[in-house]
Structures are given as structure tokens and as C-alpha cells.
């Protein structure tokens, strides 16, 4: 059985993803993907995790753009959700995608034929 906070988190994820495609016009916001949303059990805080393709400067600019749009997003949440209290929003960059791709590249390097040849020579 789902907790209410999980249902709200799913709804926030859908709404913010839709707003990124249709509603936000900030030029600082690049190609953003919402990777997850966590809502506290008391429904007072929603932490939205995102990734963005680009340099570190573009990531920082995107985070600033998202944070400047928090009021607009909360207003849209208030229109869409029937809740007594609309949660505050915090955006956090999700580095797990970069970490996963780095691990994947290391594993590919370990499994490459070139690496296997070096192991045979050392044996």
C-alpha cells in the first residue's frame, strides 16, 4: 500500500516534468530530466532531483533557473492538487547518473580485450 507522500511525490514528478516541457520559459533551464521526487511524510517539503546535460556552468545556471521558478511551480501545484498545504520545493542536482556512467565506463575498460591482453602478459 502506498503512503500518501509517495502519491504526492509521483504527482509532483509528473507536474514538474510537464512544466519543464510546456510552462517554464527561463533560458537558463537547459535539457533537464527529473530523476526523482521525495516528499516528507508531513507534506511540507518536496525535494526534486534533476539531471542536466552540459558543463558545470550550465548545471549551475539550470539549478538557479529552477530555483527562481519555485514560486511559479508551487502556484501550479496549488491549482492542480487538492491539498490543504502545498509543499515547499527544493531542487537538488542528482549526480547518480554521472556516477553510474563513470562506473560503466570503468567496467567496459576492465572488460576490454586490450585489458585482457595485458593481464595475460603479466601472468
Curated annotation (Swiss-Prot):
The lineage of its organism: Bacteria, Pseudomonadati, Thermodesulfobacteriota, Desulfuromonadia, Geobacterales. PANTHER family: RIBOSOME-BINDING FACTOR A, CHLOROPLASTIC-RELATED (PTHR33515:SF1). GO terms for cellular component: cytosol. This is Ribosome-binding factor A. Disulfide bonds: none annotated. Keywords: Cytoplasm, Ribosome biogenesis. One of its GO terms (molecular function) is ribosomal small subunit binding. InterPro entries: KH_dom-like_a/b (IPR015946), RbfA (IPR000238), RbfA_dom_sf (IPR023799), Ribosome-bd_factorA_CS (IPR020053). Gene3D superfamilies: 3.30.300.20. Belongs to the RbfA family. One of its GO terms (biological process) is maturation of SSU-rRNA. SUPFAM superfamilies: Ribosome-binding factor A, RbfA (SSF89919). Monomer. Binds 30S ribosomal subunits, but not 50S ribosomal subunits or 70S ribosomes. It is found in: Cytoplasm. One of several proteins that assist in the late maturation steps of the functional core of the 30S ribosomal subunit. Associates with free 30S ribosomal subunits (but not with 30S subunits that are part of 70S ribosomes or polysomes). Required for efficient processing of 16S rRNA. May interact with the 5'-terminal helix region of 16S rRNA. Pfam families: RBFA.
Amino acid at each position: 500500500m502506498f503512503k500518501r507522500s509517495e502519491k504526492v511525490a509521483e504527482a509532483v514528478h509528473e507536474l514538474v516534468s510537464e512544466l519543464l516541457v510546456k510552462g517554464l520559459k527561463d533560458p537558463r533551464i537547459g535539457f533537464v530530466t527529473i530523476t526523482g521526487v521525495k516528499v516528507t511524510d508531513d507534506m511540507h517539503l518536496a525535494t526534486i532531483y534533476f539531471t542536466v546535460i552540459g558543463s558545470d556552468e550550465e548545471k549551475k545556471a539550470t539549478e538557479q533557473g529552477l530555483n527562481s521558478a519555485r514560486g511559479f511551480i508551487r502556484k501550479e501545484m496549488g491549482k492542480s492538487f487538492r491539498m490543504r498545504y502545498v509543499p515547499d520545493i527544493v531542487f537538488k542536482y542528482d549526480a547518480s547518473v554521472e556516477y553510474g556512467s563513470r562506473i560503466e565506463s570503468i567496467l567496459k575498460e576492465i572488460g576490454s580485450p586490450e585489458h585482457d591482453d595485458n593481464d595475460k602478459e603479466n601472468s
